[in-house]
């Protein structure tokens, strides 16, 4: 199997994770979903703040998952349905074992 055929789930939040996500897409890797933090109010006006990774995923037209809880059954079912080969994590939350172990080749 060619590395670019792998079904990759990308997990991250800040700007420097966005750079890596964009590079993977630019290089032709198959990102089947992006997992990032839920939108949250920030600042004086409590305007909704979207993570840099979410903004990048939207710009690239990638599917998004934004679970409140990483052990949520709905999220886990959605992740399983993607049948990921590989998970790439850059500056994201601590992953529960069930998420960490889901991709058949592992999560890095």
Show where each model-derived region lies.
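One-carbon transfer enzymes
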Residues: 1-108
């Amino acid at each position: 199997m060619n590395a670019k055929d792998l079904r990759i789930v990308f997990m991250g939040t800040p700007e420097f994770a966005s750079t890596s996500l964009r590079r993977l897409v630019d290089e032709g890797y198959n990102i089947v979903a992006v997992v990032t933090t839920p939108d949250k109010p920030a600042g004086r006006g409590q305007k909704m703040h979207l993570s840099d990774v979410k903004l990048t995923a939207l710009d690239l037209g990638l599917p998004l998952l934004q679970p409140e809880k990483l052990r949520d059954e709905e999220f886990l079912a959605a992740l399983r349905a993607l049948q990921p080969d590989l998970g790439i994590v850059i500056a994201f939350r601590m992953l529960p074992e069930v998420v960490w172990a889901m991709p058949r080749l592992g999560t890095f």
